[in-house]
Amino acid sequence: MRKLAKVLLAGVAALSLTACGQAEGTTGSSADTTAKEQKQQETPEKIKIQSLNANGEEISLEVPYDPERIAVLDMAALDILDNLGVGDKIVGSASTSLEYLSDYVDNEKVANLGTIKEADLEAVMECEPEVIFIGGRLASSYDALSEIAPVVYLSTDVETGVVKSVTKNAETIASMFGLEDEVKEKTAGFDERIEVLAEKAKGHTALVGMTTSGSFNLMGNDGRCSIIGVEIGFDNLTAAESTSTHGNEASFETVVEKNPEYIFVMDRDQAIGADGGTDGKRNYGK
């Protein structure tokens, strides 16, 4: 009897443990399923961001969240996407590029979509992007590209400032992938660096120039080099001139007459691989 009682008790204990194990397993499995469902509910399929339309007006644009297929026809956007670590999602890029982004041009898996000035619409369509990034040079193609996929058109605003504009654009792009914290980390020191440069620039005059097609152009505070006169604070001696694109051509005599303490030059020819840069250096690089 005692042996039988022990056997029965052992059997009951075993059954109890098995039942507990099954209950715990069921609970764990149920919890995992619930967590996955909750994550799916929390991760949206689409989000809305602030972008520009063909006229450069700010609009609310619906884009896919965490897109897997991206077409890029803007170097600034490509730079941001590359820095965010989502370059593997790029299925097509402009043939126009910078040396440190050339992997996206030389990569056989990335389709050639034309240039940052003229998109190959057929090539864009063939790579089946979920979203397309463009810059100002392709604003005229905005509507045609929008028929293929949502078009994210971002730019810099001189009034806002180059650094703040770039940061804002990076935050916008990052929000499409849930990578906002990455942008905060990468831009954390921008303001401090600008403050240091601004202190050095106080009371000093400068000319801001660009070599392009063999000529030397002077830039105002409304162009792509506005960071020097607006945010850093050098007294740009041609600040009032309207020079939003490539600036106004200037002679060597003009530079001498202005007599700046500093001259900042952006070599556009070298940046885009044009041959004309040699002449610009010969004439103004002494």
Where are these regions (language model features)?
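Extracytoplasmic/secreted envelope proteins and their assembly/folding machinery
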Residues: P64-P67, D74, L78-L81, L121, ...
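Extracytoplasmic substrate-binding proteins
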Residues: S141-S213
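Bacterial Sec-exported substrate-binding components of ABC uptake systems
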Residues: L4-V7, C20-A76, E180-V208
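Extracytoplasmic
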Residues: P44, G56-E58, Y65-E68, M75, ...
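Binding-cleft/active-site segments that stabilize strongly anionic ligands or cofactors
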Residues: S102-D157, T205, T211-T212, N217-K286
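Solvent-exposed, acidic/flexible segments
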Residues: A71-D74, K117, G135-L138, E159-V166, ...
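Bacterial Sec-type N-terminal signal peptides, specifically the leucine/valine-rich hydrophobic h-region
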Residues: A14-L17
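A short, structured surface patch at a secondary-structure boundary
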Residues: R69-A123
